[in-house]
């Protein structure tokens, strides 16, 4: 993975799909247990990585850790990620922001559960598999604390409040990141899906500077960054490329050739077969050939995986096909990998 980031030769491309609900299902545990007990999450991640020969284990599980530790109510479900109630945000009135205290990631709350997960993963697979930590981006966390509808209106009506809220969020997320880094993660993801709902001008003016601040400080902590903005982020690609992150997840609605063109040659790109169409409803051959097309569109510095999370009911053979494609890119005298059926592909040059 790190050689891909720097453009160095690799023996094969890494396979790094995001497995959350799929990992819980693979391990035979309910998702509530997965997100509330770091030991369950770690066991499921290690089992899934071993069963499918993945090149990553991840602490990403749900978007409710930071806001929950701030005091936000959480809705819990047995077999899907928890969520905040948009009808009951923590910051109902703007003045509520002034009453919030920075949560301590070591205080025993949901953030600390992730930190302990990082330490346990380091103990179990450190040095063998890269460990992906996770924090929320400024817009995503603002939606968790304030509510999506309210923060979207705030962007227009009260940018000064948005700046204050984003400043609070960045401090909180960087404290959370520091704790995960100290516990042993190798790379950190920033999830900011809500940013894809914002137009390019507002994004550039209000969101991009805070994402940039996060990336710069994470780099000062000597931690590579993986940016995850799912949805259609086509209108944000140029700015996303300017952030200087090592890796970007590109979701299915985005044209990969355009992503490479606008973000430049130096960032690693993961994606972007549609998780439902290919992994849940497709065949292993569909997955393999879809990834070959994605690889051809991205070119160098490609990381193998779907555009977003692996659906929990995906057939195991389809997830194996993701890894099969990554393994087929091993350096050989032949310029093209074997197709999943075992025949040389004629149209998917590496």
What are these regions (language model features)?
Residues 92-102:
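Acidic/polar active-site rim loop that often engages polyanionic ligands
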């Amino acid at each position: 993975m790190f050689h891909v980031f720097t453009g160095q030769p690799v023996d094969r491309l890494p396979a790094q799909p995001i497995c959350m609900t799929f990992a819980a299902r693979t391990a035979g545990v309910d998702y509530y247990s997965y997100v509330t007990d770091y030991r369950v999450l770690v066991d499921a991640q290690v089992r899934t990585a071993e069963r499918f020969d993945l090149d990553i284990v991840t602490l990403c599980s749900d978007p409710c850790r930071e806001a929950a530790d701030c005091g936000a109510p959480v809705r819990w479900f047995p077999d899907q990620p928890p969520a905040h109630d948009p009808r009951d945000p923590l910051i109902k009135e703007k003045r509520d922001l002034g009453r919030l205290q920075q949560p301590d990631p070591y205080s025993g709350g949901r953030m600390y559960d992730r930190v302990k997960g990082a330490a346990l993963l380091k103990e179990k697979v450190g040095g063998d598999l890269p460990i992906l930590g996770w924090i929320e981006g400024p817009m995503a966390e603002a939606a968790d604390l304030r509510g999506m509808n309210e923060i979207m209106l705030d962007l227009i009506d009260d940018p000064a409040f948005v700046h204050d809220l984003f400043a609070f969020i960045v401090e909180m997320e960087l404290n959370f990141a520091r704790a995960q880094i100290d516990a042993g993660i190798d790379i950190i993801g920033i999830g900011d899906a809500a940013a894809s709902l914002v137009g390019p001008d507002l994004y550039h003016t209000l969101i991009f500077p805070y994402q940039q601040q996060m990336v710069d400080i994470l780099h000062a902590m000597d931690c590579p960054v993986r940016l995850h903005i799912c949805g259609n982020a086509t209108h944000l690609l140029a700015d996303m490329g300017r952030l200087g992150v090592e890796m970007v997840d590109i979701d299915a609605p985005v044209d990969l050739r355009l992503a490479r063109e606008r973000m430049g040659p130096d960032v690693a790109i993961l994606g972007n077969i549609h998780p439902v169409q290919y992994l849940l409803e497709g065949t292993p051959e569909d997955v393999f050939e879809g990834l070959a097309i994605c690889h051809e569109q991205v070119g160098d510095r490609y990381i193998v995986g779907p555009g977003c999370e692996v659906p929990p009911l995906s057939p195991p053979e389809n997830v194996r096909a993701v890894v099969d494609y990554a393994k087929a890119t091993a350096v050989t005298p032949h310029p093209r990998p074997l197709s999943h059926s075992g025949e040389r592909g004629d149209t998917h040059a590496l």
